């Protein structure tokens, strides 16, 4: 049976609990992926099966999950990836990054436009554009890595570009295994190509062969690992599984359950669409509505908290996401962590928010856009973000307003913040003030992202009197008259926990 839309297998469950079918499918697919992940690490680890088997099984499971969730609509993901791989094979590496980017974004924009024109958003709040967005990340990561590896000298590359540069084109299986691996194909978070290849080949953790390291590998590791001595001789490395992910997986699953409870029992009490409802607006003043916007936008973020936290747990359960050890020797499982909710909710600046929100996508924006654009980096990155998210007018309201707000915030930080560094109490007051303003600004700009449409966005901003846009503009005009403060005052702050690089980039 070919499905035009999502799988109908769980339609009865959807009708009985009143949750859209697509959301039921996605959660079910993530639960299946979690089960597959534990089995993948246990039975398909690098020391038991070949790289070929690991790649083929990961891609096959991912394709099955896609078909379960999206039915015949998943053909768009296959076509999208196939077109980009064809370009990768046929096009010269000197232009492969630009060509792949244009193909991937053009196809994605067509699907986004179709969603705007034809989709029933109430019945299908999710569609195949989600996996296509993830595929766009992955195919462009490979293409830009190839261009950097073939056409840029290593000494001219920044560290991030050098780390992800590629010196050969991936094989068909390597490419499509990366695109479709089951841990992240439905809802993310995605990984970079080199990180995935290290994982699938068993090279994401290794120890140098020397007496000291031999002592560090206990007898159980040697027995369970069954390490190939010839590989050990040739590579001078011992490859083994990362430390057990059970603890981080359990913690992330518990956190996921917490966010599910918030999403089910609290978030529905604060619908985002109420922000542009004429009756609600007529019944409440600006201050009340601004407070409601902050609460409702926080509730809107919860669905991302739960799906990305669960996605991180799925990756970790399979062994993907191990990121070395802390100085005290504890394993880190944050290589592809995509959301840090508690750090995010304590943000005192837009930069702190961005550093903890949709982390892997932000890294992608920096990798292919922000670090490569010679001017107006923030503006072009936010425009790309709007295009990548879709064609709804609300996205463009949000990201263009966000770019403007960030420029205003940077000027305030550069010229006003030094006056508050003269005492601890002033610094705390400044942090509290920026905490409030940051969360108001995020809610104010985020309403358009969630109401989606032009008229609804205009209703909200008109009845808010565009106050934050005006405040940002006035601040920028006024602060241009003030001289910049000596940079040494920022240096004092770096000694209390912020690096100089972060201060300069914020």
Question: Which residues are covered by each model-predicted region?
Answer:
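Non-catalytic, membrane-anchoring transmembrane segments at the edges
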Residues: 1-506
């Amino acid at each position: 049976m070919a499905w035009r839309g999502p799988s109908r297998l769980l339609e009865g469950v959807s009708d009985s609990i009143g949750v859209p079918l697509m959301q039921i499918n996605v959660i079910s697919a993530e639960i299946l992926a979690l089960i597959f992940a534990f089995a993948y690490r246990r039975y398909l680890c690098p020391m038991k099966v070949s790289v070929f088997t690991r790649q083929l099984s990961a891609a096959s499971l991912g394709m099955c999950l896609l078909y379960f969730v999206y039915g015949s609509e998943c053909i768009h993901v296959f076509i999208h990836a196939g077109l980009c791989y064809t370009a990768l094979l046929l096009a010269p590496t000197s232009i492969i990054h630009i060509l792949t980017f244009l193909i991937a974004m053009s196809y994605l924009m067509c699907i986004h436009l179709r969603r705007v024109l034809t989709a029933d958003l109430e019945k299908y709040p999710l569609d195949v554009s989600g996996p296509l967005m993830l595929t766009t990340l992955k195919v462009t990561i490979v293409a830009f890595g190839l261009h950097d590896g073939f056409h840029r000298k290593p000494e001219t590359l920044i560290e991030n570009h050098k780390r992800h540069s590629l010196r050969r084109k991936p094989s068909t299986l390597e490419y499509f295994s990366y695109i479709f691996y089951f841990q992240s194909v439905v809802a993310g978070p995605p990984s970079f190509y080199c990180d995935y290849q290290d994982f699938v080949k068993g090279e994401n953790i290794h120890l140098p062969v020397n007496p000291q390291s031999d002592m560090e590998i206990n007898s159980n590791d040697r027995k369970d690992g069954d390490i190939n001595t010839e590989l050990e001789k040739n590579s001078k490395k011992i490859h083994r599984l990362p430390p057990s992910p059970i603890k981080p997986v359990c913690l992330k699953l518990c956190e996921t359950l917490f966010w599910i409870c918030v999403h089910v029992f609290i978030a529905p009490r604060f619908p985002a669409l109420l922000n542009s409802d004429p009756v609600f607006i007529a019944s409440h003043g600006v201050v009340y509505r601004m407070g409601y916007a902050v609460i409702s936008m926080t509730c809107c973020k919860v669905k991302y908290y739960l799906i990305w936290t669960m996605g991180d747990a799925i990756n970790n359960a399979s062994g993907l996401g191990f990121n070395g050890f802390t100085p005290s020797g504890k394993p880190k499982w944050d290589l592809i962590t995509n959301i840090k909710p508690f750090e995010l909710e304590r943000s005192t600046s837009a930069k702190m928010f961005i550093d903890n929100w949709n982390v892997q996508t932000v890294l992608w924006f920096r990798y292919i856009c922000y670090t490569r654009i010679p001017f107006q980096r923030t503006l072009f990155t936010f425009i790309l973000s709007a295009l990548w998210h879709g064609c709804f007018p609300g996205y463009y309201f949000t990201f263009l307003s966000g770019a403007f707000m960030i420029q205003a915030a940077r000027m305030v930080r550069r010229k006003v913040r030094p006056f508050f560094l003269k005492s601890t109490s002033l610094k705390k007051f400044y942090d509290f003030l920026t905490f409030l303003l940051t969360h108001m600004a995020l809610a104010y700009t985020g309403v358009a992202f969630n109401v989606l449409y032009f008229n609804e966005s205009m209703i909200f901003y008109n009845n808010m009197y565009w106050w934050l846009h005006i405040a940002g503009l006035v601040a920028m005009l006024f602060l241009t008259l003030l001289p910049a403060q000596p940079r040494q005052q920022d240096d004092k702050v770096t000694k209390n926990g912020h690096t100089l690089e972060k201060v300069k980039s914020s």
